[in-house]
Each structure stands twice: as C-alpha cells, then as structure tokens.
Amino acid sequence: ILKSVAIKEIHHRVKNNLQTIASLLRLQTRRTDSEETRQVLGESMNRILSIASTHELLAQSGVDEVMLGEVILNIKNNTMRYFSNPKCYVTITMEGGDFQVDSDIATSVAIIINELLQNSLKYAFQDRSSGEIRIVVEQGKLYSSIQVSDNGGGFDVANTEGNRLGLSIVQTLVKDKLRGNLEIESGPEGTCARFDF
C-alpha cells in the first residue's frame, strides 16, 4: 500500500510541475506579437501537457502501468483542443486494442502520438474544409504497433524528415526509447505513420 501511495504522489507532483511549466509557456505566448513564436510555444506547451496527462493517469492508477487507450484518448482530446482550425473540420477516430503499458512506454507513446497528430493537423489539411485522422492500435505477442494516418495532401517524406522537429522527435523516441521501427508513407491521398514497440 505504501508503494502505491508513493507512486501516486510522485506522478501527481510530476503532473503538477509540468502543468506549471505549461502555464508559464501559456503566459509567455500571450505576451508575444509574433505568430511564429506563438506557434512554437504552443507546440512546446502541447508536448508538455501530453506528458502531464500521462502522469495524471498514472497518479490515478497508483501503479506504474496505465491503459494505452486512455493515454491516446487524452492526447487526442488535448491536441484537438489546442490545434483545432475553425476553417477545417477534422475527425479523429481510434480503433484497436487497449492494454496496459509501463510509464516509460506510455510517456513515449503520448509524445509520439501528440507529434503525429500535430503534424497532421498543421500540414495535412491546408486549403481543405474537412479531414480524417485514424489511430489504429494493434497488440501483438512480441511487438505491438500503432498507426496514425490521415487523408490529407501528403508530403515528400525523403526531403522533410530532418527538417521538422516533430518528426525528429518521433524518430528518436521510437528508436531510442521504444526500441522499435518507424515507417512513414505519404502521397496525394494522405500520410500513414506506423511504429512498433
């Protein structure tokens, strides 16, 4: 019981500290006139909140594991809240299994999903009035996978991978933290990113 209380307390404190940092970034965002600065601070704030929401779930559970579906749902809701575009109606659907993962995997997946959703919402649906994003989770015996796909305009993967911070973060987390593989395919019919862990 003491271990459970300690785990809850640690995750609760981490969540509160991260939310304080996000609040400071929000204040900073309000003080700038630069749209580019506002966008960069907003992206950073969303990254921090994705980690904070995972720690909130971990604090509620009292163990160092959490249901992956809950993590993804939180990230989806946060991302839609901060990156909604009144000129473009985007739906995000989730499919597949739900299973427990430890805190390290949960945090890495939260950041990865956040980055992939941000990229789709920022770039995929430019000059469009609607779009769809699908998140598919597959639990395997040795490896599990997550696929995030959109029906947007696509992009040149070969000439973009090193130029976008979000994709660099995704590549690093999949390789170094999850010890998995990342595949990105993109064309005029949309983009699909798939990673395993």
Regions found by a protein language model. Give the residues of each.
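Conserved phosphoacceptor histidine of two-component systems
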Residues: 8-19, 23, 27
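Short acidic helix/loop segment immediately C-terminal to the autophosphorylated histidine
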Residues: 25-39, 62
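Conserved short strand/loop->alpha-helix "switch" segment adjacent to the catalytic nucleotide/phosphoryl-transfer site
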Residues: 1-11, 33, 66, 83-115, ...
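Acidic ATP/Mg2+-coordinating residue in the GHKL
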Residues: 150
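Hydrophobic core positions in the C-terminal catalytic ATP-binding module
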Residues: 133, 191-197
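ATP phosphate-binding glycine-rich loop and adjacent ATP-lid/helix-beta elements
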Residues: 157-185
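Short beta-to-alpha transition helix within the HATPase_c
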Residues: 42-49, 53, 57, 64-82, ...
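Short beta-strand/loop element within the Bergerat-fold HATPase_c
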Residues: 130-142
